[in-house]
Amino acid sequence: MCEDKKTDSRSQQECQKELEELRERLKDLENEIKKKEEEVREYTSHLQRLQADFDNYKKQMEKQELEIIKNANERLILKLLDVYEDLERAIENQDSSMDGLEVIYRKFRDTLTKEGLSEIPAEGEKFDPFLHEAVMVEDHDGYEDGIIIEELSRGYRLNDRIIKHSIVKVCKKS
């Protein structure tokens, strides 16, 4: 190297050349460091995106799991709805000696309600194809067009999800 000019036998030109080579090498190394730093930033960014994607995936899976648990009883409740409605009709047509049947009906209704079951309002409401299924239409003076005249079969929600649409008769003006 050209550290000591007196003891060094190389010429000034050789020292300049060596210095230029070292500067060039330093520049190459600095460029390589910049490239590696950029790679590190890219890998870090990619890793952060993967982590965010994984966190979102976990949240989605937890949400789906809760939804599955929440609606796990849907099939059973659908089967029980016919019994529930039959009990209701029996109570409507009973005489006063059938108080026990009414107690059973209320207990059954309360159990279904606690499990997340709710009735869909129909009669007098505006027809909504997401909630109701129209099987009949009729021109009726007492109702506006598109209003439900009669509920033929009740509809139900289970935890905000429609599990049975109301079967209805709708007013349709001619």
From Swiss-Prot:
One cellular component (GO) term of this entry: cytoplasm
Predominant cellular place of this UniProt entry's protein: cytoplasm
InterPro entries reported for this sequence: GrpE, GrpE_coiled_coil, GrpE_head
Cellular localisation: Cytoplasm
Keywords for this protein: Chaperone, Cytoplasm, Stress response
An annotated Gene Ontology molecular function: adenyl-nucleotide exchange factor activity
GO biological process, one term: protein folding
Family: Belongs to the GrpE family.
Subunit structure of this chain's protein: Homodimer.
Functional summary from the UniProt entry: Participates actively in the response to hyperosmotic and heat shock by preventing the aggregation of stress-denatured proteins, in association with DnaK and GrpE. It is the nucleotide exchange factor for DnaK and may function as a thermosensor. Unfolded proteins bind initially to DnaJ; upon interaction with the DnaJ-bound protein, DnaK hydrolyzes its bound ATP, resulting in the formation of a stable complex. GrpE releases ADP from DnaK; ATP binding to DnaK triggers the release of the substrate protein, thus completing the reaction cycle.
Protein name: Protein GrpE
